[in-house]
C-alpha cells in the first residue's frame, strides 16, 4: 500500500472513532406535569419514567416530574 492510502485509512478510522465517542453518554430530559396529587411523589415519578423510557430516572420538582434518560 502506498503512503497516501495508509493515511486515508488512518484518518477514516480516526473520524469514525470520534463520531461514535460524541454520541455515547448523551442524556435527554423530559418533564411530566403533575395534576393529581398536587405535589410530586418520588415513587410515582420514578415508576412513570421507567415506564416511558428505558433506564429513565425520575426526580420530583414541586409540580413536575423530571425524567432523565439515555438518548
UniProtKB/Swiss-Prot annotation:
Disulphides: 28-71, 40-60, 45-65, 49-67
Any single GO CC term annotated in Swiss-Prot or TrEMBL for this entry: extracellular region
Protein name as catalogued: Defensin-like protein 124
Cellular location(s): Secreted
Signal sequence, start to end: 1-25
Gene transcribed to yield this protein: LCR16
GO biological process per UniProt: defense response to fungus; killing of cells of another organism
Keyword vocabulary terms for this entry: Antimicrobial, Disulfide bond, Fungicide, Plant defense, Secreted, Signal
Pfam families according to UniProt: SLR1-BP
First-listed, main subcellular location of the protein, grouped into a coarse class: secreted
Protein family (similarity comment): Belongs to the DEFL family.
Amino acid at each position: 500500500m502506498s503512503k497516501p492510502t495508509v493515511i486515508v485509512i488512518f484518518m477514516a478510522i480516526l473520524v469514525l472513532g470520534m463520531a461514535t465517542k460524541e454520541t455515547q453518554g448523551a442524556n435527554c430530559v423530559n418533564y411530566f406535569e403533575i395534576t393529581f396529587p398536587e405535589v410530586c411523589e418520588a415513587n410515582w415519578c420514578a415508576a412513570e419514567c421507567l415506564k416511558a423510557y428505558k433506564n429513565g430516572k425520575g426526580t420530583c420538582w414541586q409540580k413536575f416530574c423530571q425524567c432523565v434518560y439515555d438518548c
